[in-house]
C-alpha cells in the first residue's frame, strides 16, 4: 500500500505546534530537514496556483527506501527534485536522483537539488539551486 505525504500549508504553524517558538531554534531541531522540504514544496505549489499553472507533483520512494522528494511531470517524463536543508552540498544529496535516473532513464528528464545554502550552480549532471533562488525559477 502506498502512503501519501502530508504537508502543512503554514510551516510557521507546524513549527509552533512542534514546540519550536524561536526562529533561532529551528535549524537545531531534528525535524528541520522535513520542515525545510515542506516549505519548499508548499511554496512551489502556492506559486503555481497563483500563476494559474497546472499543479501536479508527486514523490518517489522504492521498496528499499530510496526516494526523490518531488517529481514534477512534463509530458511523459519528470523533473526529479531533491530537497535538502543543509547549507553545504554533499555527495549524498544526489543519491536518490542517481538511483531514480538509473532505474527509469526513459522517464527521467532532469535532476535538481534545492538546498539551504546560498549559491546556485550548474554541474555536468545536476542543477543545484539555492532555496533563495527557487521563487525566481517559478516566474
Across the structure, where does each feature detected by a protein language model lie?
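Accessory nucleic acid-recognition modules appended to NTPase machines
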Residues: 1-78
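Switch/connector loops and helix/strand junctions flanking conserved nucleotide-binding motifs
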Residues: 16, 90-91, 120-124
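Short beta-strand/turn micro-motifs composed of small residues
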Residues: 61, 84, 114-115
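Short glycine-/polar-rich loops that comprise or flank the Walker A/P-loop
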Residues: 76-78, 107-110
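Terminal-proximal interaction/regulatory segments of ATP-powered molecular machines
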Residues: 79, 83-86, 98
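Short, charged, amphipathic alpha-helix that recurs within catalytic cores of restriction-modification
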Residues: 91-105
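Low-complexity, intrinsically disordered Gly/Pro/Thr-rich segments
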Residues: 108-118
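Domain-level recognition of nuclease-like catalytic cores that cleave nucleotide substrates
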Residues: 116-139
